[in-house]
Each structure stands twice: as C-alpha cells, then as structure tokens.
Amino acid sequence: MEPLLIQDVLKTLPHRFPFVLVDRVLSAQDGEVHALKNVTVNEPFFPGHFPQEPVMPGVLIVEALAQASMFCLHGQLEPGTVGYLAGVEGARFKRKVIPGDQLHLYAKLDFLRRGLGKTTCRAEVDGQVAAEATILFAVAKG
C-alpha cells in the first residue's frame, strides 16, 4: 500500500484539529500499521504540560495509538463507521516525548468480532519504546 498522507488520514479519522494525532500512515496491511505523529513545539498542550519542560501527555500518546489502530481496519469498514475507544490495558510509559520528536506508532490487530476489537500497540522515538498499550475499541455507525 502507498503511504497515506494527511488528506487520506482525515478521510478515515473523524477527529479534527487539535485532536488529529496521526500525520501519516506509512504502511497498513494484514492488520498491522506503522504511522507517524510529528511532535512540534506548536502542539496546543505544551504550554500547560509543562511550561518549563514540555512533555507530551501520556494519555495523548495512548490516543495517538488508538487513532493509528483504526488503520488496521483500513478498507474493511463501511463509510460512516467510527471506532470508539472502549478500554486501555497495560499502558506503560518508558520515555518522554518532547517537541521535535517523531513518534512512530505501531498497531497490530489481535481480533475484531461483532463490532469489538483489540490491538497491541507501541510508540517509539529514535528506535526507543516510548509507550506500550493494548487498545480495546467498539466499531459502530458514527
């Protein structure tokens, strides 16, 4: 598959600024995804988290992983179908994510049955694991 640029990402995700946390999908095939989030100093959360030492909030890294997870289903969902976050298991944060980092988002579909799904995810910066989590989601008409 060709990489999906932001225009394509916005066709799949219902999110809009300031909550789009996937900038590009490098690959999405066989239930596995590799996506990118370019973390810039202009992110709206940095002035408050933290003013003297900006760090991307862990919950937003998890949200980025959840958004990337939706591309595990690329081409399988009916138009107007949305994935809703249903749970997060085993979230661990191992490295700070700061302005200038390129956050690589990896997701692998474990299952999708009766509108419920689960992905195993990790986020990396410079080849180091920044976060890991299992994402649970429900798929329904938006």
UniProtKB/Swiss-Prot annotation:
InterPro entries: FabA_FabZ, FabZ, HotDog_dom_sf
Pfam annotation, one family: FabA
Catalytic activity annotation: a (3R)-hydroxyacyl-[ACP] = a (2E)-enoyl-[ACP] + H2O
E.C. number(s) listed in UniProt: 4.2.1.59
Molecular function terms, GO-annotated: (3R)-hydroxyacyl-[acyl-carrier-protein] dehydratase activity
Subcellular location: Cytoplasm
Principal location: cytoplasm
Domain of life of the native organism: Bacteria
Entries under Gene3D superfamilies matching the protein: Hotdog Thioesterase
Active site location: H49
Record keyword Cytoplasm present: yes
GO biological process, one term: fatty acid biosynthetic process
Keywords, in A-Z order: Cytoplasm, Lipid A biosynthesis, Lipid biosynthesis, Lipid metabolism, Lyase
UniProt cross-references to HAMAP family, sorted A to Z: FabZ (MF_00406)
Family of the protein in this entry: Belongs to the thioester dehydratase family. FabZ subfamily.
Descriptive protein name: 3-hydroxyacyl-[acyl-carrier-protein] dehydratase FabZ
Organism: Deinococcus geothermalis (strain DSM 11300 / CIP 105573 / AG-3a)
Taxonomic lineage from the root: Bacteria, Thermotogati, Deinococcota, Deinococci, Deinococcales
